[in-house]
Amino acid sequence: MPRAYTVATAALTLDVSAKWIDNALSHHRIKGVRQERQGVSRQLTIEGLLTLSIARMLSAELGSSVGNAISIAQRIIAERGKMMLTKGLQIELDLESFREQLLSRLEHAVEVAPLPRRGRPPRNTTGRLE
């Protein structure tokens, strides 16, 4: 099973808010994202991060909606960086270079991203011993 990363780590890697990622994951199915029942935090694999990173770039550069950008990003990944459209239009991305840049940013984000606290907060929050 490939390693998975938290939404906070993904947000730092992609330089977006955690809310942007949560919204994208809530409204769209993305390969490489583990989503379970309510109360279980989402986790993203490298493939999920790559899809979101390409989608973010397409959305920012071309003004595409996030949903369309995710769909195009998944096709680009499936077709190894080249996507042929009708009437000769082609979208090409140096996928290996893009992935290497993503992994470099991810490496930094893993070091600084906070680990999410799960469960009920501690009962004694004043620091006093009882």
Feature locations, PLM:
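Major-groove DNA-recognition helix of helix-turn-helix-type DNA-binding domains
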Residues: V16-R42, I76
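Basic Lys/Arg-rich amphipathic helical interaction modules
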Residues: M1-P2, R56-E130
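Short helix-start
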Residues: V33-M57
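Polyanion-binding surface elements
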Residues: M1-A24
